[in-house]
Each structure stands twice: as structure tokens, then as C-alpha cells.
A protein has these predicted regions:
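Bacterial N-terminal signal peptides that target proteins for export
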Residues: 1-11
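C-terminal motif of bacterial Sec signal peptides marking the signal peptidase cleavage site
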Residues: 19-22
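Bacterial signal peptide processing site
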Residues: 24-27
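A structural signal for conserved, well-ordered secondary-structure elements
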Residues: 31-183
């Protein structure tokens, strides 16, 4: 019985910690207004948020890619094609549970996670999906509204799609202004 008390305390602390972390996520983040000034003067980049970090802990050394690393973005399929990098992007993305897309230090949107075809979790908000099944020789990256796609018609996903409308408009308008939009 003596040995079970410390274990029970540790379990209670762990559960409370996970609950507080889950409750502190920014599901009600405010929409970013569309601003042509951001498009003209801003720089697009993405940073990773580690498992033990919060969004405010993200530092400059956590930059995963910038607009210079994006070759093009297909509006129809939402495929995002990256240029060749020294370290494969999927390896750089693996330690992070969130990816924040910035335009000139303003958050455009937060991608819930980097997921691969092997992932068996369900995500009801934006994800960066790494597809290696359709082309094993070269993986493809997609920005999806959820993962797996069979959850696209749920109320939660539909609400998130509406919530992200202005951000998508800004993101695509910016990429179009840089000649990186593909239809």
C-alpha cells in the first residue's frame, strides 16, 4: 500500500498536467483580418512548437521553413511543394506537435500537427500531411482541414474551416503575390 501512494500521486499530477495543457490550447484564437499591407511588406515563415513548449516559447531557431523554401502551393489539392533542403523537411518536422505559420510576425494559422500516412490519430483542425504512399520516391505535403479526410463533414471540422477562412485568403493571396500559387 505504501508503494501505491507515490504512484497514485504521480498519476494524479500527470493527469492534471495533461488536462491543463489540453485546456490551454487556443481553440478560440481571434481571426486575423485580411491586410494588403502584410502581403506587401511581410515575410512568410513557419516555426515548430515542441511537445514541452507553448506557442509563446517559440524562438527564431525553431524556424522550419520560409517562403523561399516554398516552390508552389496548389489551391485545388492544397499540396505545398518545397524546394530541396539539406535536411529533409519531414525529419525537421517530426519533433513538433504544432506548426505556426507567420506572416511578418503575425500568426496566420496554427497547424495542429505534422502527420504521415502511418498516423492513426484523428485531427479535426489544420494538419500538414506528409503523403508517401501515392509516390514512394518523393513524399508530398498537403495542408488539410482534418486528418483523415473522412472527418471533413463533422461539425467541428466545418466550424474550423469557417474559422480559418480569412487566414486561407491571406495565405493564398500572399503566395499569389509571390508567384507561388498553382491552380
Amino acid at each position: 500500500m505504501k508503494h501505491q501512494r507515490p504512484l497514485a500521486r504521480m498519476m494524479a499530477i500527470a493527469i492534471a498536467g495533461m488536462t491543463m495543457t489540453a485546456c490551454s490550447s487556443d481553440d478560440n484564437e481571434t481571426e486575423m483580418p485580411f491586410s494588403p499591407d502584410l502581403v506587401e511588406n511581410g515575410i512568410l515563415y513557419a516555426c515548430g512548437v515542441g511537445l514541452s513548449e507553448t506557442r509563446t516559447d517559440v524562438e527564431a531557431n525553431d524556424v522550419l521553413f520560409t517562403e523561399n523554401d516554398i516552390e508552389w502551393f496548389n489551391v485545388t489539392t492544397r499540396e505545398i511543394k518545397f524546394r530541396e533542403m539539406q535536411e529533409p523537411l519531414y525529419q525537421r518536422l517530426q519533433p513538433f506537435h504544432e506548426i505556426i505559420f507567420y506572416l511578418d510576425n503575425n500568426i496566420i494559422f496554427v497547424v495542429s500537427s505534422f502527420v504521415g500516412d502511418w498516423d492513426n490519430r484523428v485531427f479535426t483542425d489544420l494538419v500538414l500531411h506528409y503523403d508517401v504512399i501515392s509516390d514512394p520516391n518523393q513524399g508530398h505535403y498537403y495542408l488539410h482541414d482534418c486528418y483523415p479526410s473522412q472527418f471533413i463533414d463533422t461539425d467541428e471540422v466545418k466550424a474550423n474551416i469557417i474559422k480559418n477562412t480569412n487566414q486561407w485568403k491571406l495565405f493564398t493571396y500572399y503566395l499569389k503575390s509571390k508567384g507561388k500559387l498553382k491552380k
